[in-house]
């Protein structure tokens, strides 16, 4: 592994869909350096894309979108957040029944919603599918 465990990589971009590709690319780069298989890297990229899209649709006009990546034992933890305050209910009440929830759940090994400093965030953990439990 080329990325030390528990080292954070943080990227902040303007909160516009045109910049989400930067977050996906950085996530793929960090994941590749943790020796995740290509399919797992693709899953992480798609999860970052979906999480970013959901946060951008909150409609609170956040100025920035931030991705924090951390190499963990056997995978990568990613937290995507927007600046500003969360909606009255976070996650939105119907989110667990949505296609976005199903997509994020299928692409990640762990999925949670957070409110660091009162700002909405989506946390995704992707572990290596090639890792042996023996």
Summary of predicted features, one role per range:
Residues 37-62:
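Conserved ATP-binding N-box helix of the HATPase_c
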Residues 1-10, 54-134:
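Conserved beta-strand-loop-beta-strand hairpin that lines the nucleotide-binding pocket
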Residues 15, 48-52, 82-84:
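Generic secondary-structure microfeatures
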């Amino acid at each position: 592994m080329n990325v030390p465990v528990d080292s954070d990589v943080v990227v902040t971009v303007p909160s516009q869909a045109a910049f989400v590709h930067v977050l996906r690319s950085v996530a793929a780069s960090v994941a590749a350096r943790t020796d995740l298989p290509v399919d797992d890297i693709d899953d992480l990229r798609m999860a970052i894309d979906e999480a970013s899209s959901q946060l951008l649709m909150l409609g609170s006009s956040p100025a920035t979108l931030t991705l924090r990546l951390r190499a963990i034992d056997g995978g990568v933890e990613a937290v995507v957040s927007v600046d500003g305050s969360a909606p009255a209910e976070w996650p939105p009440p119907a989110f667990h029944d949505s296609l976005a929830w199903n997509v994020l759940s299928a692409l990640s090994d762990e999925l949670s919603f957070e409110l660091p400093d009162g700002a909405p965030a989506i946390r995704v953990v992707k572990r290596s599918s090639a890792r042996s439990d023996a």
